[in-house]
Amino acid sequence: MASQGTKRSYEQMETGGERQNATEIRASVGRMVGGIGRFYIQMCTELKLSDYEGRLIQNSITIERMVLSAFDERRNKYLEEHPSAGKDPKKTGGPIYRRRDGKWMRELILYDKEEIRRIWRQANNGENAAAGLTHLMIWHSNLNDATYQRTRALVRTGMDPRMCSLMQGSTLPRRSGAAGAAVKGVGTMVMELIRMIKRGINDRNFWRGENGRRTRIAYERMCNILKGKFQTAAQRAMMDQVRESRNPGNAEIEDLIFLARSALILRGSVAHKSCLPACVYGLAVASGYDFEREGYSLVGIDPFRLLQNSQVFSLIRSNENPAHKSQLVWMACHSAAFEDLRVSSFIRGTRVVPRGQLSTRGVQIASNENMETMDSSTLELRSRYWAIRTRSGGNTNQQRASAGQISVQPTFSVQRNLPFERATIMAAFTGNTEGRTSDMRTEIIKMMENARPEDVSFQGRGVFELSDEKATNPIVPSFDMSNEGSYFFGDNAEEYDN
């Protein structure tokens, strides 16, 4: 639990390690991504992919999904106990795209899960390397965050679609461990808890018996994770109430929705990590780079540097704009779906536009799409500057509330104001301050009312030149204060459906 003074850095969570010093952390994260790279190279050999085909992001995603599926114990067990027609529980596969006579062809491949597990372990010194698997899950989650909107999921749990900036990591599988929990947004945790409470309301036996005891432990653990994301005493006290409730019901759902809304201004701490597609690590390993020896960090210059030197391709549909496809993948690589566009644009060095203006659909290609008209192009994933990823949420001076635009969860530790429409947010807080959490609610509302949109977050923090790897000369950008930048305004993205 974060509040117990046992904060581990994300890299420690990511690599499952106990407390380590910076060098050890860099080495173990390096070992993790190096293992991913070695696995990818081996898979390309197995599949006889050309260099170009191996750099295709769609092929990378298929290979990543195969290894995640091969290690999904729970689902594998379920598939074996509930055999469904046409699904071999022991096999996994997906589309692989090959270049034939100037055209792209789709080939569906199937592999034994056991074989995939063997190749993965071999690439990871014989270990299961759960950290590497989680890393791939977070990359897929970041890609989903940048690609899809979760309006429907929000509405289903009684939340407001404008709270989309709280939904980081909403598509992460349950099994993503501590590293996964660290990158989940406040809204994601609230949604998981509400779903659980609703099941308890509809199913009398949900909290009962031996199973119910396990359910209860999971419920309290999720409450503690969410509590650890809040930075004000009143929000945390409300989480204690929700956690200790004998029989969670509608009152708890109300409290959770209230807390989620409050997080639009009193932002939670949510970790951000640059998780790259497996093919990027593969390219680096193939060129002789030794990640473990050199060390690697997910939150510093390393991912930027890796992307400066990697050429990755993507399939492009006939009506898509390659520059927009590049923006989508760039945002996913840096976990920047919920970042202020002013900040992202400055770092990237080219204008980053809101999703409603993108002429591109998702990266993955459905099995019924026509390959005849598919083209491919280079993804432009380079940046002008680099900046340190944050896990703080950007609230100004410690406990005081800071302004939060209705759609930002900062990714980069870079000075800016967080403009917001206080009226829009506060409108959601009329009325209900009675009940057992009334004093906490009143206190939270007071803090929110005192928040000023002109307050500066991340005071004095700047971006760095790519030659400045020790982060010695911060360049503090000046932004047009009035011009807020949410990626989700005027949104028309498709919904995420499993």
Curated annotation (Swiss-Prot):
Keywords noted in UniProt: Capsid protein, Helical capsid protein, Host nucleus, Host-virus interaction, Ribonucleoprotein, RNA-binding, Viral nucleoprotein, Viral penetration into host nucleus, Virion, Virus entry into host cell
Recorded GO MF terms: RNA binding; structural molecule activity
InterPro entries linked to this entry: Flu_NP
Localization annotation: Virion; Host nucleus
Entry annotated with the keyword Ribonucleoprotein: yes
The keyword Oxidoreductase is assigned to this record: no
Residue positions of motif Bipartite nuclear localization signal: 198-216
GO biological process: symbiont entry into host cell; viral penetration into host nucleus
GO CC terms: helical viral capsid; host cell; host cell nucleus; ribonucleoprotein complex; viral nucleocapsid
Pfam families: Flu_NP
Post-translational modification: Late in virus-infected cells, may be cleaved from a 56-kDa protein to a 53-kDa protein by a cellular caspase. This cleavage might be a marker for the onset of apoptosis in infected cells or have a specific function in virus host interaction.
Motif (Unconventional nuclear localization signal): 1-18
Region feature (Disordered): 1-21
Quaternary organization: Homomultimerizes to form the nucleocapsid. May bind host exportin-1/XPO1. Binds to viral genomic RNA. Protein-RNA contacts are mediated by a combination of electrostatic interactions between positively charged residues and the phosphate backbone and planar interactions between aromatic side chains and bases.
Similarity remark: Belongs to the influenza viruses nucleoprotein family.
Functional summary from the UniProt entry: Encapsidates the negative strand viral RNA, protecting it from nucleases. The encapsidated genomic RNA is termed the ribonucleoprotein (RNP) and serves as template for transcription and replication. The RNP needs to be localized in the host nucleus to start an infectious cycle, but is too large to diffuse through the nuclear pore complex. NP comprises at least 2 nuclear localization signals that are responsible for the active RNP import into the nucleus through cellular importin alpha/beta pathway.
Identification of the protein by name: Nucleoprotein
